[in-house]
Amino acid sequence: MSRIGKLPISIPTGVTVTLKDNVVTVKGPKGELSQFVDPSINVAIEDGHVMLTENENAMLDNVKQRHAFHGLYRSLVNNMVIGVSEGYKKELELVGVGYRASNNGNIIDFALGYTHNIFMQLPPEIKVETKSERNKNPLIILESCDKQLLGQVCSKIRSFRKPEPYKGKGIKFVGEEIRRKSGKSAGAK
């Protein structure tokens, strides 16, 4: 049995969890999310908690894989409950001279030192805000109830100009430490 999987998920007030045909649907003030759960995992909703247990009679013979699925689906359902009640937020910072970002609705316009601007259409589930203050690096603030989608979009944005190790220029998460290298002049002595 998975250590993570056997922990119960408490359902906060204002959130409803339903189960139909191995699909768990979570509705809350921030939105609605659905997730298919493998038949090797049983889902039970009782007195304000969601419990996931392993189905011993499942067709899945590999016990290790069943244990892994147990922890995986518990984490996915827990992320959905947190997402529809509180939401998720990630901040990206643009480090570099002339690096800018502006948004028009759900379209972000990036100026990242290339000969052309990069435009990115965001999914409708993600809310975006850009901040540019004098003498500070521009920020992109992304919010969503879907943790997986938010992380995927942030990784895509970061891939436009990954931080380089010499000067640290590029797009990075706020609080992310970039491993720095000394230049060739430091190693020549």
Swiss-Prot record:
GO terms for cellular component: cytosolic large ribosomal subunit. Keywords: Ribonucleoprotein, Ribosomal protein, RNA-binding, rRNA-binding. GO terms for biological process: cytoplasmic translation. It comes from the Bacteria. InterPro entries: Ribosomal_uL6-like, Ribosomal_uL6-like_a/b-dom_sf, Ribosomal_uL6_a/b-dom, Ribosomal_uL6_bac-type, Ribosomal_uL6_CS. The keyword Ribosomal protein applies. Signal peptide: none annotated. PROSITE patterns: RIBOSOMAL_L6_1. One of its GO terms (molecular function) is rRNA binding. Pfam families: Ribosomal_L6 (PF00347). Belongs to the universal ribosomal protein uL6 family. This protein binds to the 23S rRNA, and is important in its secondary structure. It is located near the subunit interface in the base of the L7/L12 stalk, and near the tRNA binding site of the peptidyltransferase center. Part of the 50S ribosomal subunit. This is Large ribosomal subunit protein uL6. It comes from Phocaeicola vulgatus (strain ATCC 8482 / DSM 1447 / JCM 5826 / CCUG 4940 / NBRC 14291 / NCTC 11154). The lineage of its organism: Bacteria, Pseudomonadati, Bacteroidota, Bacteroidia, Bacteroidales.
